[in-house]
């Protein structure tokens, strides 16, 4: 059963009509999978002085109404499923002013019969006001004003059911910096966060979240240049130069014993790396690529980051309780500059930027701490040739061995949490979408530049005409894809931030490659490859995008062996020029 679990607070007296007033949490929405809850403390009846709180609050000199957004049909279906599966509600809560408060005990007693009958709508009175508990829509309806308030409950089996909560058009009173008067900053801003809190024993867990939802990005990260929301905006050269730092020694001089390589280490979730340790980890992991200039290492540092870390550590405890071992690891996540500032505020699900499909499935793809060069291939390149990688703590829990189902987007069973490519020595981790905001904590951002990066396919490189392939380089790396100008170009290719050259290996036409792999690839996969190739020829797909999809479908090992075999064969009859199309969107490897 899927259940919604958030901060639950017992009430001891009625100051606002539904329970003791507590420090307001941040504008977070919370929802997670079901966790069993033990019996909770009873709530004493309110005193006679309770009053219904005003629905409007004054913020920054203006009256703003806390908006509870319309739910989608999908959410209503989910709520209906909750209602069908739930037992008898033993504890009912309302979400007001940023916190959950209990429905008083005497009201629960008054509507006990309706609760036991599992009535979809129950009418009751409190402090002279009439309300309806709408369990199907998970809301409480004020019959006088029509105001709706989110509704949650805990049943007799200890299962918690919470809706999705949204708050917009307001700023928290706990901001520690003054928000600039700007139309963009004052625009409605929704924040949604997945969190999971286990409720057990007679204690009620408490978690205070303080946040400033400042879209300007101020105080979002310490020492990390914050990205603007629009991808059309660019870094200022002077700003970049002032932020950049050079490695004091070449990568080749780093001693591997000095680096902290934790891909196989079992962490408790409490270890904290410093920037120097992250530099060493990155340097050792990319040593096979040659000298990799690290421009900067920044830590996500803000009140929001601290709140997310607290949630992550709570999730570690929960996973450890249910699995025996949380199995926390460090892992690398490729990132785009324009979404970095939104990661802490909106989570890794922001715009779907981190969700990717591969031969292992659909989800958040990370690589082991000692294999950053694998993630580097998916890093976008900004206009200054800078790439970005995020070092994350990841709760892997019980790991599932993934067997190449590209359509898989959730675990293969309740006994698994996330997936890996190898149980004993994993290099690729997949965190399913349902866990992406609870099982991953982004901690550091590494800004770096690379020349002749194997398999790096940035957005700007994708605009070039042709791509070549060479098999030189580290043995464990896939073929190197290099950007170069086509026959119409000037003869030199200057991809952004690097000095790539023409391919060192002979040019390989796509049709020749397809013919060679056709008997080794499934028929459906070949149909997909041919369809993508047609889009490439029609200029509906960039070359870099096509090559990336080809590598995902076929696999780097098969491409490597096939290209090597074809290159070692005697030269055959010249391929017709109609096939060897040098226009953008065609050609070969």
From Swiss-Prot:
InterPro entries: Poly(ADP-ribose)pol_cat_dom, RCD1/SRO1-5, RST, WWE_dom. Residues 501-572 form the RST domain. Induction: By ozone, salt stress and cadmium. It comes from the Eukaryota. Residues 64-153 form the WWE domain. The keyword Nucleus applies. Residues 464-504, 569-589 are annotated as: Disordered. The keyword Nucleus applies. GO terms for biological process: defense response to bacterium; embryo development ending in seed dormancy; ethylene-activated signaling pathway; jasmonic acid mediated signaling pathway; lateral root morphogenesis; nitric oxide biosynthetic process; programmed cell death; regulation of reactive oxygen species metabolic process. Expressed in young developing tissues, such as young leaves and flowers and root tips. In mature plants, expressed in vasculature of leaves and roots, and guard cells. This is Inactive poly [ADP-ribose] polymerase RCD1. It comes from Arabidopsis thaliana. The lineage of its organism: Eukaryota, Viridiplantae, Streptophyta, Embryophyta, Tracheophyta. The gene is RCD1.
